Amino acid sequence: MNEELLRLKNLCVDYKVKEGYLSAVKSVSLTINKGEVFAIVGESGCGKSTIAHSILRLLPDRNEVVKGNIFFNGEDINEYTDKQLEKIRGKEIGMIFQNPLDSLNPVYTTGFQVAEGIMLGNVTREEAWNRVVKLYNDVKMSDAEKRTKSFPHELSGGMRQRVMIAMMISRTPKLIIADEPTTALDVTIEAQILNIIRKLRDDFNTSVMLITHNFGLVAEVADKVAVMYAGEIVEQGTVFDIFDDPKHPYTKLLMKALPRKTKHEGRLKTIDGTVPRLTTDIQGCRFENRCPYKIDICEEIDPSNIIVSESHSFRCHLSEGGESDE
């Protein structure tokens, strides 16, 4: 039986801008179970990272408004004070940021920075240092003991990402949020990072929220997938649901736009049009201006969430069967 770890219920995030409020995330609901890799995919600017940062209250200071519920281990941490949230940030929920060089202090060795978190658990400096070496070995860092004395700028992008992963697992969090963890890494290093993520899930029953636009990455490691467009989740299901039986027009078009290995596919397919301005009060479906299947109702009414199966749902007026949960 699946045991729930994280549940978002009607999460909304608005940023205050000159024109008013920008609806960056609208009514997002999802559940991540223990030991599960849950991928959130979509094009740049769709709200993926905003969801991740809102969980740990790391949003930029833009007079943001966060509404909805963020349940972690059964408690709504969106109601926590900053002091309460500090107790689980890093310890219970860890985050791997997109650019590890920006996340590491350039004036301290990487080993010192990893050990710093370990010593919060009342262990000696020697014990912490030995643990750092072991962690570096666990994440397949070559010449681990030597690398603990390296500064961030002395390491490659792949090695810096390993340092960040070692830092996150040093306190064995229940949930790791990985925000584009393989961006700018070559395919060999990417494969190694994927193996580390799998090992985390298998060895420690760690749950992973994987933020990415890379469908290849999703196919390799994800158990469940949510597809985002313009701040909304338009479809979610198991990785097999999304890849083998996509329902939402946007998901279908994304799948058709994926590069193929054969030379008989012709020109690379694209999705016409642009994302709507999220500062306006959008009536109807947010994808209607780009959808080749749209009907009149799409411009006027926000689509309901259609339940295809226990694991699979999508938001569209072209329901293709299934029942509405609204």
Task: Please describe what each predicted stretch is.
Residues 4, 145, 236-326:
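Short catalytic/signature loops enriched in Gly
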Residues 170-174:
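A short, proline-enriched helix->beta-strand linker immediately N-terminal to the Walker B motif
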